[in-house]
Amino acid sequence: MADTFEFEIVTPDKLVVKDVAEQMQIPGKNGYLGILPGHAPLITELSIGEISYTLRGETKYLALAWGFAEVLPDKVTILAEAAERPEEIDVARAQEAKKRAEQRLQTSGPELDYQRALNAVKRAEVRLQVASHATSKAAVGH
């Protein structure tokens, strides 16, 4: 069995990443899924969350808004509504989006789409978490 698998993450706008990994964590609808080479074939819906993948001891991260994953023994394809690398995330904008979404949750009435506001908060939190990986790498000189 191979030690790695290929993967790609695609949005409607672009190919976000095409790489090789030894392992990957993806945010499934019912929790995170761990992917290793030789994984059983699977198609699954993905939720808002952090994607991580590791190659030669280095772990990289991406923020995922929503999507689907096709997992094959030697390849993973993720079709995402939106996906961002840490260096692409505008931290100030993500903080402001989180603040606005939290304020929406404080309102009440028929105009409040509660689930949409919760998703906006979660997405902003994930973006900030992924962005923090870039900050911590810069601090240690990577």
From Swiss-Prot:
One example GO MF annotation: proton-transporting ATP synthase activity, rotational mechanism
Keyword Electron transport: no
Membrane topology per record: Peripheral membrane protein
Covalent S-S links between cysteines: none
Xref: Pfam families: ATP-synt_DE, ATP-synt_DE_N
Cited InterPro entries: ATP_F1_dsu/esu_C_sf, ATP_synth_F1_dsu/esu, ATP_synth_F1_dsu/esu_N, ATP_synth_F1_esu_C, ATPsynth_dsu/esu_N
Keyword annotations from UniProtKB, A to Z: ATP synthesis, Cell inner membrane, Cell membrane, CF(1), Hydrogen ion transport, Ion transport, Membrane, Transport
Biological function: Produces ATP from ADP in the presence of a proton gradient across the membrane.
Similarity annotation: Belongs to the ATPase epsilon chain family.
HAMAP family associated with the record: ATP_synth_epsil_bac
Oligomeric form and interacting partners: F-type ATPases have 2 components, CF(1) - the catalytic core - and CF(0) - the membrane proton channel. CF(1) has five subunits: alpha(3), beta(3), gamma(1), delta(1), epsilon(1). CF(0) has three main subunits: a, b and c.
The protein's name: ATP synthase epsilon chain
Gene name tied to this protein: atpC
